[in-house]
Amino acid sequence: QIENEYYSNIRPKRVGESGEKPLESLARAGIQYIEVRSTDVNPFLPLGIDVPQMHFMDIFLTWCGLQESGEIDDAEYERINRNFSKVVYEGRRPGLTLESASGETTLTEWATDLLNSMQPVASLLDDANHHSFHLDTLGQQRLKVADSSHTPSAKVLRILEDENIEFAE
């Protein structure tokens, strides 16, 4: 595996000079763009993503960039990985609990808190662009958190059930 393709959820990237290694390029000139790798593709959309999802990514990534972000110690790294795995494998389970630095919380509570904390960013993006697209998409995400039947995974499960298709097929 080449050094600029190591797996991580978000990769810092830069187009380097001819013959320059990716890490050398980043060290020399900084991050030019990021590659977001842990976003699900929506199977019901021709491109896998639509404009509201792009607006949500704008909100989320801007919000992330504005957060204090110290170094992650080994214990926190392990907790993040456990939470990630739980959401991937059990994310539809009602009442799913995750570990935070301050104790356990449900996925629904944590997601709601995160979406609420993103509200000012969505408002600023909308104010700057004279529209309400970001606040609208934040509302759509809140609806999915409150009622998982609005998620793409719920739609997939409904189709499987309606067509009598086993999940493993």
Go through each PLM region and give its residues:
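C-terminal accessory/tail domains of diverse enzymes
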Residues: Q1-E169
